[in-house]
Amino acid sequence: YVEENPSEIVSIYDHKTDNYHVSGTETSLRQQAVDALNQMLDAFYVATGHQDMIVISGYRTNAQQQELYDEDLQATGEQTSTRVALPGHSEHESGYSLDFSLYEDGVQSDYDGTGEYAWINENCSHYGYVLRYTEDKQDTTGIQAEPWHYRYVGQPHAAYMQENNVCLEEYLTLLKNYSADVPLSITNWDGEIYQVYY
């Protein structure tokens, strides 16, 4: 996805607001993704009063991804993984993807995006994020459903993807049908119109 240690990668902890947690000072994302994350989780707090979201994973180097992949193969005994992407193919290597969990009273628990937390799934596109790996797109993405994994793609793209129920693979394929002469017109959730092409 990207070169090792890209300069746009920043510590989430150093740039976050007070309405969520981060698993450590080394957990990082691209600045643009952190800014959108702050806006989204601040709005989530206003809507629900919850401050128990924790970012447990963000940017990973190729070597870190290889380690996770190898650990998964060892744990499952399989030749390939449907739970962990190959190094060089992980969204985390882009610096635009993160994993959520819940953290309350010193205890971390799984995030599944249900109940009041469904607000994030319903509104993440307003902040440029998409729920990346859903059960209904498993055959297309090749990755099992991960209700905790979000990817920053930008507002107009996220709005289109959510409104039309397409995953990133489908969206990128669709965009190849559009050019500067004949762009895809996307009306964002706030009424702003974007012209998008491949």
Predicted regions and their residues:
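Extracytoplasmic cell-surface/polysaccharide-interacting catalytic and binding patches
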Residues: 1-58, 62-198
